[in-house]
């Protein structure tokens, strides 16, 4: 049985997107998604939105729906990537694309190739995939490779049991919001 989610706001509001297998991805809860876009909605227009660990591509789709200049969803799992590709294609939107790759490997080059600023949304599969026990340490190492002048904001969706430092290299924590077992940490 296939599972679906819907785009909750913007020009694609109500469009249905397929969700990949729950054994390989974990979809962002509606309340988290809604809160995030309420926070950044007025700031997203000139930005490229990059969704690391894309899953279904719903956050990238929602970003373009809400006016992002461009959105990119990166997904490593092949089956999930196929679903992401199909979801993005169904929106018939030229400024929305999917990349099959490991976010830890491809993100620095993708960000550095952007002409404008990037809003980076990182939602790793922290409680799903084997080998992700040290996911937050890997994320901090990834951030060390990014050029501050290319980044408008980095937002982590993470397990509420984990708390990021108030500073990660050149980026400072500017907002934190908890939603039960899931939290969002915003860095600029």
Feature-to-residue mapping (PLM):
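General small-molecule cofactor/ligand-binding pocket signal
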Residues: 97-99, 174-177
């Amino acid at each position: 049985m296939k599972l679906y989610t819907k785009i909750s706001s913007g020009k694609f509001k109500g469009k249905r997107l397929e969700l990949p297998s729950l054994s390989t991805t974990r979809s962002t809860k509606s309340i988290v998604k809604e809160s995030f876009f309420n926070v950044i909605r007025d700031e997203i227009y000139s930005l490229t939105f990059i969704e690391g660990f894309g899953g279904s591509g719903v956050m990238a789709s929602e970003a373009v729906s809400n006016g992002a200049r461009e959105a990119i969803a990166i997904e490593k799992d092949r089956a999930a990537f196929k679903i992401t590709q199909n979801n993005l294609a169904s929106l018939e939107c030229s400024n929305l694309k999917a990349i099959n790759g490991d976010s830890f490997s491809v993100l620095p080059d993708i960000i550095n190739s952007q002409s404008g600023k990037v809003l980076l949304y990182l939602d790793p599969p922290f409680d799903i995939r084997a080998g992700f026990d040290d996911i937050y340490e890997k994320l901090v190492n990834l951030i060390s490779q990014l050029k501050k002048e290319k980044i408008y904001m980095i937002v982590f969706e993470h397990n509420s049991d984990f708390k990021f430092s108030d500073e990660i290299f050149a980026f400072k924590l500017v907002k934190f919001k908890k939603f039960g077992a899931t939290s969002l940490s915003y860095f600029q």
